[in-house]
């Protein structure tokens, strides 16, 4: 039995997220499993590191799949890229130890959120970034972002559908960079609740627009009140990388 680790990139714009929810669901996981199943002639299931929401993109999703066949990594990669839709790519395939599990062995995940902060639409990135015309106050956003760093109960920044045993997570770092009209927000942590990054970014945007004070981040965290947090569109969000 061979355990293959897949590095995956995708444009999530037309999909219902990563996780296969049932037969016929238009998901990234479902598309990859369909191609692998055709390759080996039986039903195949893969394990993904991160369950991205509908519309969210990935630059560094990781999955693993166990196959009894002795395919080379080149054969697996070439077959997948030949038959997957053009908005899903497998960038690397490697053989890993049998015990490797892409979800349970993941230590940290990094998400990137892209904002186009100019008074005109970016013709090429309009589907891959959130457009905000009003100039954002970056210094206030940076100040607010650092209040997320550390271990906190992120109930206020989770979705009501979240069914985790605990809503406590640790954020290792948040950086905000102004890059030629784009504002790139990177969030690195040990794990994320459903909609957590989008709610964090949405709140930072409200701070940048002057709708909230930076210090209110702590108030919202302590309140555990989901209605107090902002919510950013999925368009600008990317799963950038996972460390093991």
Swiss-Prot record:
Keywords: Isomerase, tRNA processing. SUPFAM superfamilies: Pseudouridine synthase. One of its GO terms (molecular function) is tRNA pseudouridine(38-40) synthase activity. One of its GO terms (biological process) is tRNA pseudouridine synthesis. It catalyses: uridine(38/39/40) in tRNA = pseudouridine(38/39/40) in tRNA. It comes from the Bacteria. Its EC number is 5.4.99.12. Belongs to the tRNA pseudouridine synthase TruA family. Formation of pseudouridine at positions 38, 39 and 40 in the anticodon stem and loop of transfer RNAs. Homodimer. This is tRNA pseudouridine synthase A. It comes from Bacillus sp. (strain KSM-64). The gene is truA.
């Amino acid at each position: 039995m061979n355990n293959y680790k897949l590095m995956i990139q995708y444009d999530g714009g037309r999909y219902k997220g990563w996780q296969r929810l049932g037969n016929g669901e238009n998901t990234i996981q479902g598309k990859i499993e369909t191609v692998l199943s055709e390759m080996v002639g039986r039903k195949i299931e893969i394990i993904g590191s991160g369950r991205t929401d509908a519309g969210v993109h990935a630059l560094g999703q990781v999955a693993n799949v166990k196959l009894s066949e002795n395919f080379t990594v080149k054969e697996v990669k070439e077959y997948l890229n030949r038959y997957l839709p053009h908005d899903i790519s497998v960038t690397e395939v490697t053989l890993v130890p049998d015990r490797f599990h892409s979800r349970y062995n993941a230590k940290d995940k990094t998400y990137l959120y892209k904002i186009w902060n100019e008074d005109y639409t970016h013709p090429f990135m309009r589907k891959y970034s959130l457009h905000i015309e009003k100039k954002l106050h970056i210094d206030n956003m940076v100040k607010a972002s650092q209040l997320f760093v550390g271990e906190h109960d992120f109930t206020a920044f989770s979705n009501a559908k979240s069914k985790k045993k605990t809503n406590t997570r640790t954020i290792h770092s948040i950086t905000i960079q102004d890059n030629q009209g784009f504002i790139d927000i990177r969030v690195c942590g040990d794990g994320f609740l459903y909609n957590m990054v989008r709610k964090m970014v949405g709140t930072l945007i409200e701070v940048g627009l002057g709708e909230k004070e930076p210090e209110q981040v702590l108030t919202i965290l302590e309140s555990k009140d989901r209605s107090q947090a902002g919510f950013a569109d999925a368009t600008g969000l990317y799963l950038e990388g996972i460390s093991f």
